[in-house]
Amino acid sequence: MTPRQRRLGLLAAALACCGVAAALVLNAFRANLVFFFSPSQVAAQEAPVARSFRLGGLVASGSIRREGDGMTVRFVVTDTARQVPVQYRGLLPDLFREGKGVVARGQLRADGTFVATEVLAKHDENYMPPEAAAALKQAGQANPGMAGAMAAQELRR
């Protein structure tokens, strides 16, 4: 084997290793990437069915229903334009309330019910996740209590 052939062989092996490494990294990102959708986007069928994503908005008033087992909770998440029914089995955060901001992670079933595996509640009256605030602002339903939070988020950018 000539030195030139050896160099080409090493170069080909290095490129193959880089290609495999890049493919593994991209696959890991794709598997762990979780998008955020508002109820309006879910209603417009922009959200994937049977794939994990985050759903954010407000818990609709009068929508919280606990089932007989004490662990399963059904509620509705809204951006005041559209609503998505949510089913969650587990302990809810202490700050989970009707009319408050919530971000749920889970999957959308074919029947339109979002099955959450994790529910996060807004932790104080001035904070709302940027994605949820933007979705509510886009729907034209930003309430006066959120105005300060959204202004603070704009200043941080």
Curated annotation (Swiss-Prot):
Chief location category: membrane
Family named by the database record: Belongs to the CcmE/CycJ family.
Single Gene Ontology BP annotation: cytochrome complex assembly
Molecular function GO labels: heme binding; metal ion binding
Intervals, Periplasmic compartment: 29-157
TM spans (from-to): 8-28
Entry keyword annotation includes Mitochondrion: no
Highest taxon above the source species: Bacteria
Name this protein carries in UniProt: Cytochrome c-type biogenesis protein CcmE
Compartment annotation: Cell inner membrane
Record organism: Cupriavidus taiwanensis (strain DSM 17343 / BCRC 17206 / CCUG 44338 / CIP 107171 / LMG 19424 / R1)
Topological domains, Cytoplasmic: 1-7
GO CC terms: plasma membrane
Membrane topology annotation: Single-pass type II membrane protein
InterPro entries to which the protein is assigned, alphabetical: CcmE, CcmE-like_sf, NA-bd_OB-fold
Known function: Heme chaperone required for the biogenesis of c-type cytochromes. Transiently binds heme delivered by CcmC and transfers the heme to apo-cytochromes in a process facilitated by CcmF and CcmH.
Span of the signal peptide: none
Residues where heme binds: 123, 127
Keywords assigned: Cell inner membrane, Cell membrane, Cytochrome c-type biogenesis, Heme, Iron, Membrane, Metal-binding, Signal-anchor, Transmembrane, Transmembrane helix
Tagged with keyword Cell membrane: yes
